[in-house]
């Protein structure tokens, strides 16, 4: 038979062990790294890629057969696409309001209304991709942290991005996925689907990283999945398993960054 004193001693010891274990769990929980919010992740990614410099700078680069210039200053922006480096022969200009104008030898020319939006979208798209993830804090952007996932042994935050109809442009229905490295906040992979021209899905792998005046530029390998609209979250596994078809490389040539210093 167990005595009353022995029983009390047992339960006292048992309670003490339970309390110590509970305190230990609390300490471990408090020491565990906290997952940052999606806004904190995107802010860090933009800062890491040179966002504060991009805010007020002129950026020049060549893409395929055209020359591009982006000027951002005090919240305003002008995107240009030119046929020659000096921007004399033909210059397309897209301003902050979304107005598109084409100049030929410095004189504005008429562009059919049916083509204006197509040209504007083309100019905007090249400039948008050239400085990603800059732009992910635009008012029309909705961001969601899906999870933390490994790709080729590297840990990434997987961020889903969608757009509101108001301010999201003609392609507001497109969906994006960004893979942002958990250690240094670089964007190493991007996937998106689109609805125009019968629609489709693409997966892009960043390579050839360069830092120019504090701004990160990368080129991309552009892949296509076997099916038209697979879940974007499936594409990293398909990439690792060599199930994607390489369509092209997207190369930003000779990028220049000229900071604008306000008076």
Regions found by a protein language model. Give the residues of each.
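N-terminal secretory signal peptides that target proteins for export/translocation
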Residues: 1-13
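Bacterial N-terminal signal peptides
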Residues: 17-27
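N-terminal leader/targeting segments and the immediate start of mature chains
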Residues: 30-67
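Flexible, processing/modification-adjacent segments and terminal tails
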Residues: 34-40, 101-172, 194-197, 256, ...
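Extended lipid/amphipathic-ligand handling interfaces
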Residues: 45, 70-72, 207-209
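Solvent-exposed N-terminal domain segments of exported/luminal and surface proteins
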Residues: 53-95
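Gly/Pro-enriched, hydrophobic low-complexity segments
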Residues: 156-257
């Amino acid at each position: 038979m167990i005595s009353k004193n022995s029983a009390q001693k047992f339960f006292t010891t048992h309670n003490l062990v339970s309390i110590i274990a509970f305190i230990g769990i609390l300490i471990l929980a408090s020491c565990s790294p906290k997952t940052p919010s999606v806004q904190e992740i995107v802010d860090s990614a933009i800062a890491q890629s040179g966002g504060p410099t991009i805010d007020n700078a002129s950026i020049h680069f060549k893409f395929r057969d055209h020359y591009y210039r982006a000027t951002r200053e005090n919240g305003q922006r002008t995107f240009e696409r030119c046929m020659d480096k000096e921007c004399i022969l033909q210059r397309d200009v897209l301003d902050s309001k979304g107005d598109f104008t084409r100049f030929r030898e410095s004189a504005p020319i008429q562009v059919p209304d049916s083509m204006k939006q197509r040209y504007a979208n083309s100019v905007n798209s090249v400039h948008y991709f050239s400085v990603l993830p800059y732009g992910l804090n635009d008012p029309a952007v909705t961001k969601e942290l899906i999870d933390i996932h490994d790709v080729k042994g590297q840990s990434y935050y997987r961020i889903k991005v969608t757009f509101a109809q108001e301010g999201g442009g003609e392609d507001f229905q497109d969906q994006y996925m960004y893979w942002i490295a958990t250690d240094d906040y670089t964007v190493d992979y991007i996937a998106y689907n689109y609805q125009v021209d019968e629609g489709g899905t693409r997966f892009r792998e960043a390579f050839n990283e360069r830092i120019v005046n504090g701004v990160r530029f990368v080129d991309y390998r552009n892949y296509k999945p076997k099916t038209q609209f697979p879940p974007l979250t499936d594409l990293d596994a398909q990439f690792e398993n060599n199930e994607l078809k390489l369509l092209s490389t997207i190369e930003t040539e000779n990028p220049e960054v000229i900071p604008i210093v306000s008076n």
